[in-house]
Amino acid sequence: CDLTYDTILLVSDTIPINIGFIASYIKKYLNNEVEISLFKYPNSVIEAIKKNPPDMIALSSYSWNSNLSEYLSSITKKFNPNAITIHGGTNFPHKHELQKIFLQNRPHTDIHTLFEGERALLSVVKRILESNLERKKIFELPIDGCVFIHPDTKKFTKVKQKFIIGKSLERIKDLDEIPSPYLNGILDKFFDGKLTPFLETNRGCPFTCSFCHTGSDY
């Protein structure tokens, strides 16, 4: 999900190429082992959750939708308490001590990816499949490209909660490694006359502006 508030106007009015990239990347490696549905509008995903609660839900986390994503995570947990909720995006601190505080303030978020989401989320999905949806096995070991507070320690005081940090993953240097979500049709339903398509021609940046994450060195 790459959610936008839509009560009065669309806060984010672009076709969600971000989740399109991630879905295309995961399908490239796992194909029919997984079933993926993409969402932009909150009511659509809420209806889908009620009708068929997912085993896992992944949501983007930006300054304009982070709270909305946490709310949808809580709804998912309501209909399937065992569902794995993952957030990813730029609205996340770089320092580990701040990441822990961030997750402590979002109790319905199980896992947060670090930096680019394709490889990190693929790591999560593989772990879920290997664990046969058993929550205890999913969180037994660190997950590459991700951080989480171990579920068994969430009931402890914040100081004693165990913060697990996965191995850092390299940037994807060749964008052709990711199948085009426009060419494979996974974004077709978002051409609804409300959203504007856009393209990504590169990643990274030689500059390190304080207000932007694109030039972050990792």
Where in the sequence are the language-model features?
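A structure-centric signal for secondary-structure junctions around beta-strands
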Residues: 4, 16, 140-143, 195, ...
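Proline-rich low-complexity regions
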Residues: 3, 16, 54, 81, ...
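Structured loops at beta-to-helix junctions and adjacent beta-edge loops in soluble globular domains
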Residues: 1, 149-151, 168-169, 181, ...
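Radical SAM [4Fe-4S] cluster-binding motif and immediate context
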Residues: 14, 160-162, 176-218
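Short glycine-rich His-centered loop
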Residues: 1-11
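Conserved post-Walker A coupling segment in P-loop NTPases
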Residues: 172-174
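Glycine-rich beta-alpha loop elements in corrinoid/cobalamin-binding modules
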Residues: 11, 18, 25, 29, ...
